[in-house]
Amino acid sequence: MCVPAKQGTLHAKSPLPGLKIAGLLLRPRAANASSVDPRVIIYLERLLALKKVDASDVLSSAFQYSKDRLPKTGDDGSSKDSGWHNPPELEEVVFHRLSKAFQAEERPVNSTEGLRTLVVVTRWMQTMVTSHTSDTMIQAMAGIQQQPQQQSINVREGLGMLVVGVIENQKMLNILNKHHIKNCKSPGRSRKSNTTFTTNLATGEWRSERRSRTETQDLKSLRSNFEAVDWIFPTINTRAGLYIFLNSLIDSQNMATDLITAAFDILANAMYRSEPSQNMFCLKSFLINKIPILLLQISSSMFPMTAELSITQALSHVDPNAFPAFSQGFDDMLGNTNSLADVRQDFLNACALHGLITTATVERLLGETPMQGPPGTKYDKSTLLEQCKSNFDKISMYIDELDNLDGNAGAIVGAIAEFIPHLCETQMTMYLKQLSSLLFKKPQAIDVILQFTSPASILRPLCQILDDWHYDSDQGEYQPVYDEFGAVLVLVMTFMYRYDLTYHDIGIGAESFVARLMTKGNQSMLPDEMTDEQSKHLGHWLKGLYDAGNEGLSNDVFASCSPREFYFIVPTLFKQTVMALSAGILTFESVKGGLEYLMETFLLPSLIGGLIWMSSYALIQSHSDLDAIMRIFREVISSAPSSGDAQAMHSTILSIVSSRLEKCLRTIQRRDASRANSIEPLIQAIKGNLHSERSMFASMKELEQWTNAPNSTLHTSLRHTVQQLSQWASTSSIQPNPPSYTHRQVYVSLKIMGASKVIKAIVDELKAQTEASNGAAALDVGVSIICAPTVDDSPVPVAWLSSPIPASNPPRTRLNLREMLKHEFDNAAALVATDPLAAETVVRLHRRVEAQLSSIAENALQGHGSVLNLPNVNMGDMQSQSIPDDITKAIDDAAAASIADDITTMDNKALQRSMDDLTGPDGLDLSSIGMGTGDAGTGDMGAELGNLPDLDLGDMSGMGMDMDMDMAMGGGGDDDWGLDFDNM
C-alpha cells in the first residue's frame, strides 16, 4: 500500500523529530529477536538520504535497544524490558553503512550531527567494553574458556570501522577545530574507554583465528594475551631508511648526523656496485658541495648540538674500508678513478669553507695532516653574478670550476641560474650561444647544476627565447641565426633527454616550440599532412642540400624558413633522403655532400630528429630501405666534423640518441647476421656516448641481475632487498658498509609488476621480518621505500630549495605506493580470516606511512586548502599514535559547543542541555514518546512494524522534519569518557 498523497502535507504541518522516527523504526518487535527485518535497513537508508533522520538519530536509537547498553541507574536488570534487544546483525549493518558514509564524507551534514554522533559513538565504545569485559571476567572466574562468538566480533569490528571513519572525516575535524568552541563538558579527556575498546577490538578481530587454535588457558594466560596485543613496534628512524630516501632523490633531512652518514653510505654503495665514474662524481659532488650547505641551513636548529659534533659522529659511522685514510689510499688513487680516499678530506675542507668547523679541526678529524686545505675564497652568488655581467669570459672559468670538489659549487650554480635569464631578457643571443656550448660540452657540470636548482630555472627562460626568436628587419646573414638558435636548442635537448624530462616538468605550455618538438619533432609527415608552406620549405632544403648543379645552401633558403619551421620538417627531410637514395634517385655522393652541410654547427642539431626517426624506421621490416639507412648511419656516426665546436656538438648529439641507436643496431644485428661486420664498428663508435641518461630506468644488466638467479623474480628480488636493508639497519653498528641498493629496482618493479604487487612484496617481507623479531627495522625500511620521493607520481612534493624558478607539478599517471597501500588498508578486513598477520602488517604500515607524511599534508592544507590527511588508525596501534594538541583540545571542547555556522535557529543553551542529557548516567529513555519495549499495544507509536502499511519511499520527499535537540543517552559509568586523540 502506498502512502496517501496528503502524507507529506501532514508531516509538514506536524513534523516528527528524527530521533522519534529512528526510535520507531529500530524498536524491537519481539523479545530476543534473532533476525533482521530487511525493510528496516531499506527505510533507514531512504530516511538518511532524505535527511529525515541523521547518523546520531540512528545510532542513539540503535544503542537504546542494544545488548551492550547497561541498565539505567538503580535497575536490577530484571525488568520486563531486559529481553527486548535488536539482534547484533542489525547493529553490524548500521555500523558498516554509516562508516561508509563518513569515509566518503557524505556525513555529517551539519555540525550538530557531527557532535552528537561523536558523543553516541564514544558512549557506545565505553559500554561495549564494559559489557564484553564483564562477560569475559565472569567466564574466566567460572573456569569457562569460551571463544567470542563471530557475530560479537563482527559487531566490534563494525563499530571500530565507524570510529575510524569518524575520526578520519575532514568535516568532523573542521567542526572540532572551530576556534569559538568554549565551555565544554570535556568528553575527550578520559583515555580509558577508547584504549580498552581498541584492545578488545584487536583481541576479537586480529587475534580471533590465532586464539581459536590455542589450547585452553587460565585467567593469567588470558590476561597475558590481552597485554600482548598492546605491543607494537617502536617508532625508530634507521640508517637504512634515510639511505633509501637519499637513493631515490637527494634531498635534505632534519638530523644532521644521519644526513651525513647516509650520504657517505650512498657513495660507498656506488663504489661497491662499480658505478660509472660520472655517477661517482655526481655523488661526491653532493656530499662535498651540497651537504655542507644543508648543514649550514639547519645548524641554527641543532642547539645545544654543534655541526662539529654531528660531523664527528657521522665520520665514526662510515665504512673505513670504503673511505680509507688519504695516506693509506694514495696508491689506490693512482690507478682507480673511483677511489674514495680523498673524499673525507674534501668533505671536511668544504665544511671548513662554510664555517661549520675550523681548519685545525680538519686535521684532528682526519687523524693525519691533510694534503691540502680548504679554498682560499668562499664564493658569493651575487658577487659572481655581477662579475659575469660585467665580463662574460668569467662564466667560462666558473663553469670549469664546477669540476672542483671544494664546496663552492652552490654559489656558482646560483650565479648561472640567474645569469641565463638575464641573457634571455636582454636578448644577448651570441652570449647565449657561447654559454650553451660551454654547458652541453660538460655533462658533469649539468649534473652539479641540478643538485642546486630546478630544471625549470634553466630551461624555462631558454624555451621562452626559442619561442620568441625572430629575424631582425635588417637581417643580412641568416645562417648565424641558425647557429645561435641551434646551440641553445642542443642545450635544451641535452637536459630533456639526459634527465628524461617532459614539457610538464619544466612548466611550459603544450604549444611551446620545445613541447611540440618533443612530441612531434621525431615524426615524418606524409605529403597530404604537410601545409603548402611546409612543402615549399622542404623543396627548398632538398634542392639546396642535394642539387649538384646548384650553388648549395644559399642565404635565401635560410631566409625563407625560420629555424623553428626547419626542425619540424627534419624527419620528413631524412625520409625523403633515404627513399631517394634507396630508389636511385639520389647518388650517395650527392647525399654525402648534403650530409656535410648537416654536420656544420648551424644545422648539426637536425641530427637529433633525423637519427631518432631513422632508428625507428630501420626497425620496420615492411620496406627495402635498410641498405640506404645503414650507409647514412655510417656517414653520420663515423665521420667527425672538422671544427672543434662542431665535434663537441656532434658528440653531445650522439649522447642524446645513443641509446636508441644502440637498440636499433643490435636489433638489426640479431635479425641479419650478415650485417654483423658492418654494424659492430658503429656500435663501437657510439660506445663512449652510451649511458649518458640520468633517468629512473634500469639497465638490462641490472634487470638480468635481479631476475636471472635461480627461482628469482622481481618479487623475490625486491623482498631480498628489503631483507638485506632490514638486517643492516639492525646491525649497522657492526656492519658499516651498506648492502647493494638502487632505487631503480623499485622503479622497474613498479613499471613491470605494478604498485599492488610491489606493496605485496614489501608486506610479505615485513611479515617474515616480524616473525624473525626484526619487525621494527623492517617497518622503517618499508615506510622509507613507500614515502621516498619519485620522479612520477611522488607521494610527497619535490621542492627545489633556493631555485629561482620552482619545479612544476607534472600530471599524475597512476597510483603511487602510498595510494595503493591505502587501497590495501581499506580492504584489510577481508584478510583477517585468511591471513591475520598480513592484515596487521598492512594496517601498521599504512598508519606509519601516513604518520610520517602527515606534516607535509598539514602544510599543504594550510597553504592550499587541500584535504587534511590524518594518520589512519591501526586498531592494534592506536595507543601510540600522536595527534596534535590543538585537535585534542578541539575534541575536548566539542561536546557543549555552539556552532553558529550550522545552528542558526537554536540557542547555545539548548545545545548545551542536549549534550548534558547525552552524557547523563541514566541513559536514553524513549518511553516518554510511547516507545517502551515490550508494550507494542500501548500508544500510537507502538505499532508493530509488520502492521505498518507498505510505504512508498518515493513519496517521502515532502516529509519536512526538524531536528529535536532533546536527546538523552544511556551508558555505563559516570566518569569522564571519550576519544583520546593524544594517545592514539
Curated annotation (Swiss-Prot):
Pfam family membership, one: Med5
Any one GO BP annotation for this protein: regulation of transcription by RNA polymerase II
Record carries keyword Acetylation: no
Subcellular location: Nucleus
Keyword Lipid biosynthesis: no
Principal localisation: nucleus
GO molecular function terms noted in the UniProt entry: transcription coregulator activity
Keywords: Activator, Nucleus, Transcription, Transcription regulation
CC terms in the record's Gene Ontology section: mediator complex
Family matches, as InterPro entries: Mediator_Med5_fun (IPR014801)
Subunit structure: Component of the Mediator complex.
Sequence similarity: Belongs to the Mediator complex subunit 5 family.
The protein's role, per its UniProt record: Component of the Mediator complex, a coactivator involved in the regulated transcription of nearly all RNA polymerase II-dependent genes. Mediator functions as a bridge to convey information from gene-specific regulatory proteins to the basal RNA polymerase II transcription machinery. Mediator is recruited to promoters by direct interactions with regulatory proteins and serves as a scaffold for the assembly of a functional preinitiation complex with RNA polymerase II and the general transcription factors.
Protein name: Mediator of RNA polymerase II transcription subunit 5
Species of the source: Phaeosphaeria nodorum (strain SN15 / ATCC MYA-4574 / FGSC 10173)
